[in-house]
Regions:
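Regulatory sensory and allosteric helical modules in signal-transduction proteins
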Residues: 59, 64-113
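A short, aliphatic-rich beta-strand micro-motif
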Residues: 117-125
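A generic structural motif
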Residues: 140-142
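A generic structural signal for residues located within well-ordered alpha-helices
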Residues: 33-36, 82, 115, 147
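Well-ordered alpha/beta subsegment
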Residues: 128, 144-146, 151, 161
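Short hydrophobic/aromatic beta-strand element in the GNAT-like acyltransferase core
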Residues: 53, 120, 133
């Protein structure tokens, strides 16, 4: 398969995520490496929607510390502690966090001052343990909704499947 990225901004979000899911699954067919998958997903999600920042923060000390992993965009924060900011909150509470206006989120970490909204999705290994979080930032307020939550949660389910 040729390595291509899709621009899906013109499609309704739910339809765009269905197309993106098929593209991610086809691209990662036969791959069992988590870092390769993170890099690939970051690229494909980022270019599909034209986000400000798209990437993973990996759990390096369970329950305590996240460290930047593969991403697309400007320089990311290098480390985030559990419970701090949107990423740390999603990791500590093991749940997707969708923030329409980052200025209203207590303790928001501004890695890039242009970020206005954010969604962070927990990523689990096949044994259910937390591997990372997927962080997506936008320059627009309220850029993310339920279609994004559902679509991104389905995408990162790739990591739960045993290989």
């Amino acid at each position: 398969m040729a390595e291509i990225t899709l621009d899906l901004r013109a499609l309704p979000r739910a339809e765009a995520y269905r197309e993106l899911q098929q593209h991610v699954d086809a691209t990662l067919e036969g791959i069992d490496d988590e870092i390769t998958a993170m890099a690939t997903m970051s690229c494909l999600v980022h270019h599909a929607f034209g986000h400000l920042w798209t990437g993973f923060y990996r759990v390096v000390e369970p329950g305590r510390l996240l460290r930047v992993g593969p991403y697309q965009g400007t320089l990311g924060c290098l480390e985030i502690t559990f419970g701090r900011g949107v990423c740390g909150t999603a990791a500590a509470e093991d749940r997707t966090v969708l923030v329409e206006d980052v200025e209203t989120f207590p303790g928001h970490i501004a890695c890039d001052g242009r970020s206005r909204s954010e969604i962070v999705v927990p990523v689990h290994r096949p044994d259910g343990s937390l591997l990372a979080v997927l962080d997506v930032d936008s320059e627009s307020l309220a850029a993310f909704g339920e279609a994004d939550r559902e679509g991104l949660e389905r995408l990162v389910a790739w990591f739960r499947r045993a290989r």
